[in-house]
Structure formats: structure tokens, C-alpha cells
Regions:
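Active-site-proximal helix/loop segments of hydrolytic enzymes
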Residues: 42-214
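Alpha/beta-hydrolase fold active-site loops
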Residues: 1-2, 174
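Active-site-proximal loop motif in hydrolases
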Residues: 2, 7-54
Length: 214
């Protein structure tokens, strides 16, 4: 089994706007900027760092179960890769599952909770039932671990979208997890601790293994 983990954004993005603002294919005939900086907690803990830490923890747990893990980036100090390249890495690895790890930055009053996104309407067979089942597994795993579903986006923890390049360009089962809202005080506090990030990682790992049939 092969799982591609895609920790969103990167630590060097903010200092390289000319690189990350370059338009790249986003699927459905659209383009998008190569990448973005991501959000942060009000105290300044960056989403890129959260994504990276959680992804590394998930990768370690999956590797211990015999899963081959591929990361779309190898540090939290680089730039990119662009969203189209991230999708290509999953395709090239013939991944059984591609999971993008993110956190949201909504400033809507009271906005909190996680949501999982998949490409809809699907552009290929992998984006159909396989990606939907992966998204469901991630939703169920996070909820089982005690995380609440989003009260501001999607329905029952699922938020299908048609505009995300990494999902649109994937030919493998793919889903994107927004673990919570970094602008919510409670979720920001959890994300800012190693114990909190381990909780997210454990839930995501269990969900992926469930999807893979382990």
C-alpha cells in the first residue's frame, strides 16, 4: 500500500511571492497560484508548521504498519511545491490514498470544527466513489477521536468542492482535511501543542488504515 501525505503550504512561501503567485493549472480549465502561505493562529503559529508536524506523525505511524509513505515536501523551510506538482506526485506514486493536511483560518464569529473536502463533481473514476469513501473515512475517524465537525462549512463534516487543484488533478483517491479553525481559541490551543497534534495524527492515521482495510 502507498499513501501520499500532502502537508499544505511551506515555511518558505511567504518570502517568495514571485514563485508562489505564478499561475498553474488547477483543473476544469482554470488556473490558480502555485501555492499560498496558509493561515496562522492569532498568536502566530503557522498553518504550514502544523500541517508539517501532523503529516510527519501520520507518516511515522503508517510506516510502522508497513505502509509506504510519500510526502509532497521534505521540510518546512522550502517553497512550494506548486499545487499541480503536489497532485502529480500522488499520481506518479500510484497512491492508494492521497491525504492533504491543512487547517482553516475563518474569522467568522464562532466558527470551529473540522471538515473534509473531495472533488465534486468528479473528473475521473478515482474522484468518484473512492475519494468520497476516503473523505468519509477521514470524517468518521476524526469524529470518533472526539473532534467536532465544522459548524460553518459543508454538511456533517464533508465539504465537496470543484475548485481545488490538488483534488481536481488527482487520478488517485484523494481528500483534503481541514483539521479545524486556527482562529478559534480552543482549536488554536490544541493545534499549538505537541499532544494536540498527536491527537490529530492518531485520528487521521486510524482513518487512513480503515480506508485501506487494515
Amino acid at each position: 500500500m502507498v499513501v501520499v501525505l500532502d502537508p499544505g503550504h511551506n515555511g518558505g512561501n511567504a518570502a517568495n511571492p514571485s514563485v508562489i503567485n505564478k499561475p498553474v493549472p488547477a483543473g476544469r480549465g482554470a488556473t490558480k497560484p502555485c501555492n499560498t502561505t496558509g493561515t496562522a493562529t492569532n498568536a502566530g503559529y503557522g498553518e504550514h508548521a502544523f500541517n508539517w508536524d501532523v503529516a510527519r506523525r501520520v507518516g511515522g505511524e503508517l510506516s510502522a504498519k508497513g505502509v509506504r509513505v510519500v510526502f509532497t515536501r521534505d521540510s518546512d523551510t522550502g517553497v512550494g511545491p506548486c499545487v499541480d506538482r503536489r497532485a502529480a506526485l500522488g499520481n506518479e506514486a500510484h497512491a492508494d490514498a492521497v491525504v492533504s493536511i491543512h487547517a482553516d483560518g475563518s474569522e467568522a464569529a464562532g466558527a470551529h470544527g473540522f471538515h473534509v473536502t473531495y472533488s465534486d463533481p468528479p473528473l475521473n473514476s478515482a474522484q468518484g466513489q473512492p475519494s468520497y469513501m476516503l473523505a468519509q473515512a477521514l470524517r468518521d475517524g476524526l469524529r470518533k477521536a472526539g473532534f467536532g465537525v465544522s459548524n460553518y462549512l459543508g454538511s456533517d463534516g464533508l465539504a465537496p468542492r470543484s475548485d481545488l487543484a490538488g483534488l481536481n488533478l488527482s487520478t488517485r483517491p484523494a481528500a483534503l482535511v481541514e483539521c479545524g479553525n486556527m482562529r478559534d481559541a480552543g482549536e488554536a490551543a490544541l493545534m499549538s501543542t505537541a499532544d494536540g497534534r498527536q491527537r490529530y495524527a492518531d485520528a487521521i492515521t486510524a482513518a487512513i488504515l480503515s480506508y485501506l482495510g487494515d
